[in-house]
């Protein structure tokens, strides 16, 4: 429910929700859809990639809702986003040709291609092994360092040490809201992990 509200899929039943200075509660469904497509990037646990399309085509999708962006510009931005997440060599690969970590990188590229005000990540490392999870956390920390707002939902308490602010919910209520003054580096944690055997 919280992510549906934050993602402009639902409106709050009470109170106000402002996204990038705009009140969401009073908006029409179509206005929320436009806001969602231009201001919010989504990253899901199960990637939500279209199976028979290439990485570039998947990343282009959010830009298709903006008539001011030409197809050439769409492709250019999608390629840049994929290069930024380390997939410049997988542009034409389809989902069945990529690992879970690569698919999640495509999902992150798709989330940032619109330069959104906020990125919502729902259990974004939930389906990944430890090493790949930390590779994804490194990307999120880099995006945050660039000034992006990221709301990362997780049930894994070990991940809170890598974020700047932690809010714990129980039964829809905030039970803890704390600032992390000692944010751990996901890159350092990744570097300390044993290398996979096929890399040695």
Q: Which residues fall in each region the model found?
A:
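ABC family nucleotide-binding domain
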Residues: 1-162, 166
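Conserved beta-strand-loop-alpha-helix hinge in the C-terminal portion
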Residues: 173-199
């Amino acid at each position: 429910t919280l992510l549906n509200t934050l993602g402009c899929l639902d409106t709050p039943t009470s109170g106000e929700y402002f996204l990038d200075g705009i009140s969401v509660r009073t908006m029409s469904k179509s206005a929320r859809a436009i806001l969602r497509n231009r201001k919010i990037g989504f990253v899901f646990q199960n990637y939500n990639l279209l199976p028979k399309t290439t990485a570039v085509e998947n990343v282009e999708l959010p830009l298709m809702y903006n008539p001011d962006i030409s197809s050439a510009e769409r492709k250019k931005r999608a390629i840049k986003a994929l290069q930024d997440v380390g997939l410049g060599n997988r542009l034409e690969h389809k989902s069945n040709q990529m690992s879970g970590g690569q698919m999640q990188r495509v999902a992150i590229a798709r989330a940032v291609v619109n330069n959104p005000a906020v990125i919502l990540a729902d259990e974004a490392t939930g389906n990944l092994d430890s090493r790949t999870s930390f590779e994804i956390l490194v990307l999120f920390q880099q995006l945050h360092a660039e000034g992006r707002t990221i709301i990362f939902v997780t049930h894994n308490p070990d991940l809170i040490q890598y974020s700047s602010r932690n809010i714990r919910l129980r039964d829809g209520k905030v039970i803890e809201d704390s600032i992390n003054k000692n944010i751990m580096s996901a890159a350092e944690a990744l570097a300390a992990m044993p290398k996979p055997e096929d890399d040695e």
